[in-house]
């Protein structure tokens, strides 16, 4: 048991003195306090141009947390979330997606800089966040962004009908279908072309945001010029059609980026790290590659300490879904289909940026791929986003951990993969033609995990006792001790180093000894009474009167001369309210009808005793209390005991196809044999269905054609008769003949143009 559990523990604090002697000779301790193999290139430190030394080559890439409060400033949730990454042993953590202007943001829950707030107000909110990020000496760099035309209507403080800004008035094209075009036009519209004054304002906003980040304690900033954001919009010819000083040539399109970097360098202290996130370009287009290389040289000369290579925009989100080629490889099940998306572009620009470390982000899913990229010199650092969300302790527990430990056998690097769940959008949503919808579906699981992590302040070992939920293990420095772990959703605890399920018979002390947690970090919480969701224990549940016919005074535990208070009433409502059934185990055991009847009596007692006139009438005359009235027939049927519906094994509990399968298996005492179908039979069924559909369509077409011909013949006949009558009326005839014709026409009109004898005779004579 101890060997099995211990094999998951890689925290240095869990190794005692005896275990230190057993470490392999090739094992060393890096700057993050992690035991790594001496020849592992991923674990070697690197020094940036600014003098900042990173302990290893793993970077927690920037992510959009989308959980900022209304004031757009980080709160305790951000501290909790980034504290997990700070404990993970990352070489650098990119705290992502901070918008430099609260008027232009990507989502309503983005962190941003509200320039109506003072510097002190912003620094006061950022400083605790930076302290949490910098825990354990982790180097944290804040990513600064401006979405430009990718800011939807209503997302910022600029107003619902105010336009977003962009280098040129070029609208987003998020799909070619009518639905995609309509949705894009509604959400984003056509941006307003920026004036020179607007550009100067954006440059100053980047500079102020960087200065505030430095004052708050961050080690640096990363200027986001990728993913289709404003600065990338200036760099690209697709969105920048200007002919002034900020467009027309590669150098002019890069001018705003150079100005932003120069302005930041002017306001931050020496040694402050300034990096850049850059989009990859199509290597098949020599023109695009040539322009990009020219721009990268200008940006490098402006002074950057690293360049992060990524890719994708809102129009083509390859940063999430990967390039088209990689997606096709993944569908075919080819190996390494998800390995680095943008490594080829990094290789192409590497010779043109000597001395500038390159970070490649996107698509790394194996330790082998990471190590080969670093060892081969194709990149200096590797950025991980989704794997970092799944496991914030990834460097410490997986990538940089030694191959051989005292707890288990050697694990080959080629067998170690990084989990990153891929969630496909439903077929019907794909037909809309908006790739961003697929991205939203795919990102939902990681978004949920980030929001789960923000609830936990700190924990590295988690013990889950399904059969004894009153016990828990938690870190002593957690304010809110983690309890009742078995009732929580499983994905909440993927952020913790280990989750162990044990039996009620397991010796808790022996288990803790086997895990060997550091005594200054962990302790076993004492057995606690089960807690309700409102925070009170079960022993606080008020007793129900023992008498079979309680009075309102009995129910609310009052004497006749006591002044009325709602304290007891509130307690009982929290317990017996129909929406809270099951929150208190002691009450949950009561039949459903009994709970409802008690709740009715509680409400009736409160209504009577809280009204002085009703209470006086009840005290003197004994009227107004309905607790003893016999139930009506309708109430008897409605409140009849129906707990049998909720008994285990009852068919009424089945809600899905899987429930019915399990129910039949339990009833029959065996698993039902599945019915398999060969490929030939399946193909035959498909062909038959197609033939049936074809015959049905052919029959419908023939019937429709026949009906059309009959309708056409009837219409031609009616038109011919009308023409014949009109011709006869207009011919030269005597007065008597015209009167006679008029009378017959009137007769025909009355009888819906039924042919008269005169018409028949005329047609026959003709």
Swiss-Prot record:
Topology class, membrane: Single-pass membrane protein
Gene3D superfamilies, alphabetized: Aldolase class I, DnaJ domain
Keywords: Flavoprotein, FMN, Glycoprotein, Membrane, NADP, Oxidoreductase, Transmembrane, Transmembrane helix
Binding site for FMN: 61-64, 143, 385-386
Polar residues: compositionally biased ranges: 1-13
Regions crossing the membrane: 675-695
Signal peptide per UniProt: none
Binding site for substrate: 224-227
Sites carrying sugar chains: 30, 70, 136, 634, 650, 654
UniProt similarity note: Belongs to the NADH:flavin oxidoreductase/NADH oxidase family.
PANTHER family in the cross-refs: BINDING OXIDOREDUCTASE, PUTATIVE (AFU_ORTHOLOGUE AFUA_2G08260)-RELATED
Protein name per UniProt: NADH-dependent flavin oxidoreductase iliE
Upper classification of the organism: Eukaryota, Fungi, Dikarya, Ascomycota, Pezizomycotina
């Amino acid at each position: 048991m101890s060997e099995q559990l211990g094999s998951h523990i890689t925290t240095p604090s869990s190794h005692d003195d005896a275990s230190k002697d057993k470490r392999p000779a090739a094992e060393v301790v890096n700057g993050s306090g992690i035991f790594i193999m001496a020849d592992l290139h991923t674990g070697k430190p690197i020094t940036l141009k600014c003098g900042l030394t990173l302990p290893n080559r793993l970077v927690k890439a920037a992510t959009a947390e989308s959980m900022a409060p209304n004031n757009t400033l980080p709160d305790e949730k951000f501290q909790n979330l980034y504290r997990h990454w700070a404990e993970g042993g990352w070489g650098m953590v990119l705290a992502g997606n901070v918008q430099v202007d609260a008027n232009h943001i990507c989502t309503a829950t983005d962190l941003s800089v509200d320039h109506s707030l003072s510097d002190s107000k912003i620094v006061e909110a950022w400083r605790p966040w930076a302290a949490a990020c910098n825990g354990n000496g982790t180097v944290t760099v804040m990513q600064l962004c401006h979405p430009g035309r990718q800011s939807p209507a209503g997302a910022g403080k600029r107003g619902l009908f105010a336009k977003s800004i962009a280098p040129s008035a070029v609208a987003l094209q998020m799909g070619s279908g009518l639905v995609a075009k309509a949705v894009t036009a509604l959400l984003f519209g056509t941006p307003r072309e920026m004036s020179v004054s607007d550009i100067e304002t954006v440059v100053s906003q980047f500079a102020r945001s960087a200065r505030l980040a430095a004052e708050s304690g961050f080690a640096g900033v990363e200027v986001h010029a990728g993913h289709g954001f404003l600065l990338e919009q200036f760099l690209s010819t697709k969105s920048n059609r200007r002919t002034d000083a900020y467009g027309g040539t590669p150098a002019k399109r890069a001018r705003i980026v150079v100005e932003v970097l120069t302005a930041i360098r002017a306001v931050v202290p020496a040694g402050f790290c300034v990096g850049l996130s850059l989009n990859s370009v199509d290597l098949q287009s020599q023109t695009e590659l040539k322009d990009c290389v020219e721009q990268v040289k200008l940006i490098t000369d402006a002074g950057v300490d690293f360049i992060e290579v990524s890719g994708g925009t809102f129009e083509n989100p390859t940063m999430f879904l990967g390039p088209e080629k990689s997606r096709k490889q993944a569908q075919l099940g080819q190996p390494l289909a998800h390995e680095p998306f943008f490594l080829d572009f990094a290789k192409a620009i590497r010779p043109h940026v000597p001395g500038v470390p390159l970070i490649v982000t996107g698509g790394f899913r194996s330790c082998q791929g990471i190590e080969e990229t670093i060892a081969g010199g194709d990149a200096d650092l590797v950025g991980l986003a989704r794997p970092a969300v799944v496991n914030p302790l990834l460097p410490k527990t997986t990538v940089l951990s030694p191959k051989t430990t005292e707890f288990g056998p050697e694990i080959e690097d080629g067998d170690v993969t990084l989990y990153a769940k891929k969630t496909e959008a439903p077929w019907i949503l794909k037909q809309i033609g908006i790739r961003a919808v697929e991205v939203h579906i795919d990102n939902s699981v990681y978004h949920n995990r980030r929001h789960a992590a923000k609830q936990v302040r700190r924990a590295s070992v988690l013990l889950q006792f399904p059969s004894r939920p009153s016990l828990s293990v938690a870190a002593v420095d957690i304010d809110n001790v983690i309890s009742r772990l078995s009732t929580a959703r499983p994905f909440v605890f993927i952020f913790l180093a280990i989750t162990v399920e044990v039996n009620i018979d397991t010796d808790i002390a022996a288990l803790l000894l086997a895990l060997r947690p550091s005594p200054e970090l962990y302790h076993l919480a004492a057995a606690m009474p089960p807690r309700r969701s409102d925070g009170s224990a079960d022993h606080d549940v008020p007793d129900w009167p023992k008498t079979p016919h309680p009075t309102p005074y009995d129910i609310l535990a009052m004497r006749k001369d006591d002044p009325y208070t709602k304290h007891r009433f509130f307690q009982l409502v929290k317990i017996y309210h129909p929406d809270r059934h099951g929150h208190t185990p002691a009450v949950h055991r009561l039949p459903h009808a009994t709970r409802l009847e008690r709740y009715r009596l509680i409400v009736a007692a409160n209504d009577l005793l809280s009204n002085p006139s009703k209470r006086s009438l009840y005290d003197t005359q004994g009227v107004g209390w309905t607790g003893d009235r016999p139930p009506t027939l309708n109430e008897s049927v409605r409140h009849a005991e129906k707990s049998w519906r909720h008994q285990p094994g009852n068919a009424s509990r089945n809600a899905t196809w899987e429930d019915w399968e399990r129910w039949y298996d339990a009833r029959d005492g065996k698993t039902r044999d599945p019915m398999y179908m060969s490929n030939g039979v399946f193909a035959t069924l498909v062909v038959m269905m197609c033939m049936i559909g074809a015959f049905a369509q052919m029959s419908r077409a023939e019937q429709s054609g026949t009906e059309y011909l009959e309708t056409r013949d009837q219409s031609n006949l009616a038109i011919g008769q009308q023409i014949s009558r009109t011709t006869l009326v207009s011919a030269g005839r005597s007065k008597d003949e015209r009167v006679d014709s008029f009378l017959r026409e009137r007769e025909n009109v009355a009888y819906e143009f039924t042919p008269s004898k005169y018409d028949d005779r005329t047609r026959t004579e003709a």
